């Protein structure tokens, strides 16, 4: 007993959706920048410290609750500094500053975000290891026609991850 439903396409709904002008302008800039290019990007990796013992101590459901609470704090702070959450990788968050929207002080924004993230996560009795690096990276679509992601690639993003791995918690 299947029924076919019609879902309206976003393009068909644009006449009926109100988008504030500042957001519309940012969306247009971001769309133009999504073609893929080498650009200055600041990558921030934030990884929960002591996650393996934590995951052994609690049920899977409780671990997911803890991780989600941590991720909420990270996401809220990154967005507050106008960064972009790229993805969650296990117990790690990858965020970009300067992609797709660029600010002249993106590296500073990422550092301020990292400090605020540490403060917020301490309230949850957790600590993070954070790594940040800025450099020229490819930012744009990666993948195949059947599955694409928008991400950044290059040695400078790998350095951010290595710095995160070497960092002390908190």
What is each PLM-predicted segment?
Residues 1-39:
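Regulatory cytosolic signal-relay segments
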Residues 5, 55-58, 121:
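Leucine-rich amphipathic alpha-helices with coiled-coil/heptad-repeat character
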Residues 12, 51, 160:
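Generic structural marker for isolated residues within well-ordered, non-membrane alpha-helices
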Residues 20-21, 59, 154:
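Glycine-centered helix-coil hinge/cap
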Residues 22, 49, 136-137:
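Alpha-helix/helix-capping structural signal
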Residues 26, 30-33, 73-80, 116-123, ...:
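Amphipathic alpha-helical regulatory segments at dimerization interfaces
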Residues 30-113, 150:
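Catalytic NTP-binding/metal-coordinating core of nucleotidyl cyclase/transferase enzymes
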Residues 96-170:
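Catalytic beta-strand-to-alpha-helix segment of the class III nucleotidyl cyclase homology domain
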